[in-house]
Structure formats: C-alpha cells, structure tokens
Amino acid sequence: SAFSFHKARKEVVDAELDYSEKLSKIISEISNKALAIPISLAGSIAIFKLTTKTDWIIALIGLIITAIITSAMIVSQKKQLARISHSKEILFGQLRYRIKDDTSDLKESLEEAIKKLNDNEDFCHKVLDSLLSLAWMPTFIGIIGILFKLMPNIT
C-alpha cells in the first residue's frame, strides 16, 4: 500500500541521516583532539634547540605522553566507528529483508544509501588510521633530534 511504501521510504531516509550524523560526529570529535599533533610537532622541532640532556628527556617524555593520549582517543573513536557500523548493518539488513520483494525505486534508494554510508565509513577509517600514524610522528622526530644531538658525543 501507499502508506507502507511511504513509511518504509521514511525509515530508509531517517536511518541514512542518523548514521551520516554519527559518522560525522566521529570525525568532528577527533578533529579537535587531533590539534595536539601539530603542537607536538612544534615541540619535537624545539628539541633541536634544547641544550641539556635533562631538557631533551623531559621534552621527549612529553611527546611520548601526548602521542599515547592522542592514540588512545583515536583508538576509542575507531571502536565507536565499529559499533556504529555494526548497528548500521543490523538495521539496514532488516530494511533490506523487509523490502526484498519491493518493485519500486525504494530498493534502489536503500542500496544507494548503503553504498554512500559505506563510502563515508571507509573515509572515516582512512582519516582515523592516518591520524593514528601522525600521532607518533612528533615522537619519532624528537627521537631523531636527540640522536643528532648525541652523535657528536659518541666519538
């Protein structure tokens, strides 16, 4: 009937909007926290200007702690993304089952919504994976800086 068709279409649209919003929230929440990465990068470059071993060690410990905290936040967001993905699969699986025999464009709309949400989810995974790698870059630059400082003292 027209009523059940309209109801099913509304469910598809509502589900798509809900999951799009949840994916967007993951990226926006982590983007504010990811600002620690460029700040740490500045700190890692500052290691090259430090003169005492105590300063180097304190700066490096600060970089490591920042990388650990940033990584933990990113991993938490990755887990949240996995939970969102799982619930999306359950809901859209139910919708797929309910309209499997539908001959209207509703089935096509559902498949298009699922594809777009999967694309957004893949993008979120790539962003989070990139940020996880970038979170450790300042620490590695700091270690390289300290090694360069120690090189003249090795011989």
Task: Give names to the regions the model predicted.
Residues 1, 154-155:
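N-terminal soluble segments of membrane proteins
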Residues 1-30, 34:
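Membrane-proximal, non-transmembrane alpha-helical segments
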Residues 1-12, 96-112:
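Short, charged cytosolic
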Residues 51-55, 99-114, 122-128, 151-154:
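Short, structured coil/loop segments at alpha-helix boundaries
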